[in-house]
């Protein structure tokens, strides 16, 4: 009879770190963010008062064993609130761009800087990461940056933000160009921006492959002039979302100096389908979708096809509404199976501004529509 003895060490057990009333950890600062391992879960339980904490996740999970940061709702479904106002950071953490976000993913000195992977942030209300609010970090009390975000993904791969409420920040969500394979799902993003500024948005993203699905986007904060969903990614999919108001509902522009994105074939293919886009009277811009670029360097523009189908667009504007603004003659839209309804007379609705090519098939537009108002 043969006896086989394995000399391999047993696989480490994933840990559940529970935070909240009557739990092992009373505060978010008690969690060892610097040493999370694949399969670990941070379970933040709802309590009546918000958690005034901010932190960085700079660790790597795996596809089978992601690192999860999960809110456990209250008795009536209330999400645990993470409030950036007067928030503190666990002293052992050391990371740059502290003023850019309440929850930050990627970019740290301690833990050691890696590209975070397979991170899930779920079921949290994250709010109030913006000027003039302050926080206490490694350099003492400081003010948030104007473009701070509720969730700031500086870099990472296979990052999911799901079921979160992101509001009252400069940007609700910010994803930098060091990110790839991003999923934003079933979130409610509203009430973000900076007063009088067009540069902060409900979400502002630039990634290699990103999907927005099942989200609700509400209006920006009063007096804020940014767009609702602004993106510079290669491999963008926007599907099954409700997107309401903003300077534009969708602002899909160029990747700027990120040549890796501009040279990728995915940069030329953008998919927007199954969404409801709503425009109320009084919004600053009469255009619903902008596609192509805004850098002024037309050679950087997308110069591809926006596949726009199975969407419902509703405009309550008393004046004109324009469905598409294409930034150059190199932009193209394949527009099919959409419904566009305006409450004004059909003659106040136009398909395009001037540039680019638009192919139409099986759409319903209010009778009297025009090709362009120009």
Language-model regions: role of each:
Residues 12-51, 55-57, 102-104, 109:
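Acidic Gly/Asp/Thr-rich repetitive segments characteristic of extracellular carbohydrate-active
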């Amino acid at each position: 009879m043969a006896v086989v003895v394995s000399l391999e060490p047993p696989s480490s057990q994933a840990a559940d770190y529970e935070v909240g009333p009557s739990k092992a950890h009373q505060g978010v600062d008690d969690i060892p963010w610097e040493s999370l391992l694949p399969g670990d879960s941070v379970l933040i339980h709802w309590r009546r008062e918000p958690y005034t904490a901010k932190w960085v996740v700079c660790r790597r999970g795996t596809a089978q064993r992601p690192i999860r940061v999960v809110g456990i709702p209250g008795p009536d479904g209330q999400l645990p609130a993470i409030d950036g106002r007067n928030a503190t950071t666990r002293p052992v953490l050391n990371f740059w761009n502290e003023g850019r976000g309440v929850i930050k993913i990627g970019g740290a000195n301690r833990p050691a800087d890696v590209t975070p992977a397979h991170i899930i942030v779920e079921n949290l209300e994250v709010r109030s990461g913006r000027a003039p609010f302050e926080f206490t970090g490694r350099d003492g009390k400081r003010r948030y940056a104007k473009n701070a975000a509720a969730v700031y993904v500086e870099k990472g791969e296979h990052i999911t933000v799901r079921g979160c409420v992101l509001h009252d920040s400069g940007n609700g969500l910010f994803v930098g160009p060091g990110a790839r394979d991003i999923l934003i799902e079933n979130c409610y993003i509203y009430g973000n921006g900076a007063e009088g500024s067009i540069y902060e948005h409900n979400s502002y993203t630039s990634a290699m492959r990103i999907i927005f699905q099942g989200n609700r986007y509400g209006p920006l904060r009063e007096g804020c002039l940014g767009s609702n969903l602004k993106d510079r990614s290669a491999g963008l999919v926007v599907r099954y979302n409700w997107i309401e108001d903003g300077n534009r509902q969708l602002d899909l522009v160029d990747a700027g100096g990120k040549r890796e994105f501009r040279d990728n074939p995915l940069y030329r293919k953008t998919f927007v389908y199954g969404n409801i886009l709503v425009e109320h009277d009084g919004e600053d811009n009469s255009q619903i979708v902008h596609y192509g670029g805004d850098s002024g360097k037309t050679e950087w523009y997308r110069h591809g096809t926006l596949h726009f189908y199975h969407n419902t667009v509703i405009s309550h504007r008393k004046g004109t509404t324009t469905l598409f603004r294409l930034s150059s003659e190199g932009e193209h839209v394949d527009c099919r199976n959409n419904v566009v309804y305006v409450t004004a007379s059909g003659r106040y609705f136009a398909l395009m501004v001037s540039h680019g090519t638009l192919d139409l098939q099986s759409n319903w537009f209010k009778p009297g529509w025009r090709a362009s108002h120009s």
